[in-house]
Structures are given as structure tokens and as C-alpha cells.
Amino acid sequence: MTADIIYIYSDGACKGNPGAGGWGALLVAGGHRKEISGGEPNTTNNRMEMTAVIRALELLKRPSTVEVHTDSQYVQKGVSEWLPGWKRRNWRTADGKPVKNQDLWQQLDALSQQHRIVWKWVRGHAGHPENERADVLANQGVLQARQY
């Protein structure tokens, strides 16, 4: 890992879909690590996956080079492939339907424009230590959400 790159490992979890959900992220830069997590009582897995990345990017104090590792193809493909078309079509899908989670996509889009980001999809639960940690944090968020 290079010290000038901020690595973000994110995950979302949902018990029921919709249901109680949690998100977690691990940020690694140089020798520093920061863990964040949270939850919502009634949400979806995709909203939690997106929230994990949003909350991590919100912590960055200045424009940075970032590598986001997510096991969510929805997030990775959404940002890398689908977002430009949605914006061109005024937040409509290719078949004219409103984009789901538009509020979060707009937040993620705005935050992404502040940084140089490489989006990397990783297979979930494949033994990658940082992504496994993000999964633990997301499940802690589910437990927090169930207490509401």
C-alpha cells in the first residue's frame, strides 16, 4: 500500500430487505486505520452499501487519491457505468423509470467528484481481511439499528 492513497473497505448488511440494516467502513492511510459503522431500523442492503462509502468519503478533509473496495456490484457498477446515463436522462433508468436511491446516488456523485477514486469490486466473504472487517462493522450496525 502506498502512503498517499487512502484505501476504503466498505460493506452493508440488512436483516430482511427491507429491514434493520447496518453499514461499516474501514479507512486505511499510511499506518493509520479508522473504523466507522452505523445502522438504520428500516432500510435495504443497497442503501447500506452506499451509505458505507458515503460516510467514509465524508471523513476525508481534502481532495485525495482513494481506492474503494466494495463487494457491491450495485455500488461499483452504479458509479462506474450507470451514473453518467442516469444524469443525462434526468435521473431516469434506460427504460424511463426513476432511479432507485437517487438521494444517495446524488450524495455519492458529489463526494466522488472531490477525489480521484478507483472503484474495485471484491468478492464478498472471500477471506480478504479488510473487507471481512467491514462486514463485521456492518453487522454491528444492524445490531445498533435493532435497538431503535
UniProtKB/Swiss-Prot annotation:
Its main location: cytoplasm. Keywords: Cytoplasm, Endonuclease, Hydrolase, Magnesium, Metal-binding, Nuclease. It is an enzyme of class 3 (hydrolase). One of its GO terms (biological process) is DNA replication, removal of RNA primer. Residues 2-143 form the RNase H type-1 domain. Mg(2+) 2 binds at residues 11, 135. Gene3D superfamilies: Ribonuclease H-like superfamily/Ribonuclease H. Signal peptide: none annotated. Pfam families: RNase_H (PF00075). Binds 1 Mg(2+) ion per subunit. May bind a second metal ion at a regulatory site, or after substrate binding. GO terms for cellular component: cytoplasm. Mg(2+) 1 binds at residues 11, 49, 71. Its cofactor is Mg(2+). GO terms for molecular function: magnesium ion binding; nucleic acid binding; RNA-DNA hybrid ribonuclease activity. It is found in: Cytoplasm. It catalyses: Endonucleolytic cleavage to 5'-phosphomonoester. Its EC number is 3.1.26.4. HAMAP family: RNase_H. Endonuclease that specifically degrades the RNA of RNA-DNA hybrids. Belongs to the RNase H family. This is Ribonuclease H. It comes from Thiobacillus denitrificans (strain ATCC 25259 / T1). The gene is rnhA.
